């Protein structure tokens, strides 16, 4: 989206704060319904980030697939479950929880140091979608495939990982 600089920056700050607050809400709310709605806020903010970066198809796919399907499925699953069994064991802290917290915290700090130490301006994409093939000679589906495999490769892979985690979580909840 071609916006003037200050408006674009204000929208980035607003969406970033919504993303951080939604992520904190997913983790910190004890009520699973509120956590699911916070996840919906996070997914909507991510799709709005895609709109700001001019990738409208990825934004539409994010809204339709994740907000429209996965988050609604999570909300229905949480609403049909018996909530009392989760509140009884809420304050128990096991060794596995401590090890998991330690591993996740170390991964977080290593990611923060890697991101801050990397020179992002030196990264050059080797292949652009306009260098592969003439755009007039291919269909829309082929253009989407080319864009997903070149320009939007990283967001596409991250969305795939989020979907995989959602499926594993749904299977784990169904087995209990």
Curated annotation (Swiss-Prot):
Annotated membrane topology: Multi-pass membrane protein
- UniProt keyword annotation of Transmembrane present: yes
- Write the Enzyme Commission number(s) for this entry: 7.1.1.-
Q: Where is this protein localized, as stated in its record?
A: Plastid, Chloroplast thylakoid membrane
- EC class name: translocase
Q: Does the keyword Transcription regulation apply?
A: no
Membrane-spanning residues: 10-30, 32-52, 61-81, 92-112, 152-172
**GO MF annotation, one:** NADH dehydrogenase (ubiquinone) activity
Pfam families (UniProt xref): Oxidored_q3
Keywords for the protein's UniProt record, in alphabetical order:
Chloroplast, Membrane, NAD, NADP, Plastid, Plastoquinone, Quinone, Thylakoid, Translocase, Transmembrane, Transmembrane helix, Transport
Q: Which reaction does it catalyse?
A: a plastoquinone + NADH + (n+1) H(+)(in) = a plastoquinol + NAD(+) + n H(+)(out); a plastoquinone + NADPH + (n+1) H(+)(in) = a plastoquinol + NADP(+) + n H(+)(out)
Cellular component aspect of the GO annotation:
chloroplast thylakoid membrane
Regarding protein family, the annotation reads: Belongs to the complex I subunit 6 family.
Q: How does this chain assemble?
A: NDH is composed of at least 16 different subunits, 5 of which are encoded in the nucleus.
Q: What does this protein do?
A: NDH shuttles electrons from NAD(P)H:plastoquinone, via FMN and iron-sulfur (Fe-S) centers, to quinones in the photosynthetic chain and possibly in a chloroplast respiratory chain. The immediate electron acceptor for the enzyme in this species is believed to be plastoquinone. Couples the redox reaction to proton translocation, and thus conserves the redox energy in a proton gradient.
| Name of protein | NAD(P)H-quinone oxidoreductase subunit 6, chloroplastic
